[in-house]
Amino acid sequence: MNRCTRLLLPKAAITLAAVLGACTTTRGPASVPTAERTGQSWVVTRPIIAAQVLDTCSRPSPGREAGRVSGYWAPSRQQVDQLEARLSSLEAQVPKVLDFDRQYVGIESAGKRLIYINAFHLPDDSGVNPAREAIRVCDGGAQFWGAVFDPASNTFSELQFNGGFGGP
């Protein structure tokens, strides 16, 4: 093998591999599927975001009653697990209650530590981070709801749905 052949042979092999690789009919998936489950939950810990979550526009919430919320706190993993273990008790009022995504806000009210639930359906590709952003929707009916959970009594109260869609 002469010197010229030794230099050109590797270049020719690389070019041939690139051409053949471009002609292949086997392709990988256009996108990688994710296995996110429905009904995810996030604890909101920043007070300014917590106040925004409670500032609902088409349903009553503790944050809309002047002076009712005296402070915020972060529910523990155990308290969130306790709440989520009881969610199915709302199934009669909220069909498929476990399919809703939820934000949890710890509120202090009348000397009690309660957890406010803001429930919604978040699109998979929304780019929104419910742990750091308030999810606020006006109208929407039963697709958006809120409730209060009392960890001390293990009960829900104040279940409220958003108002209906406006217009004729």
What does each of the following model-derived ranges do?
Residues G21-A22:
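C-terminal motif of bacterial Sec signal peptides marking the signal peptidase cleavage site
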Residues R27-W145, F149-P168:
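Intrinsically disordered, low-complexity acidic regions enriched in Pro/Ser/Thr
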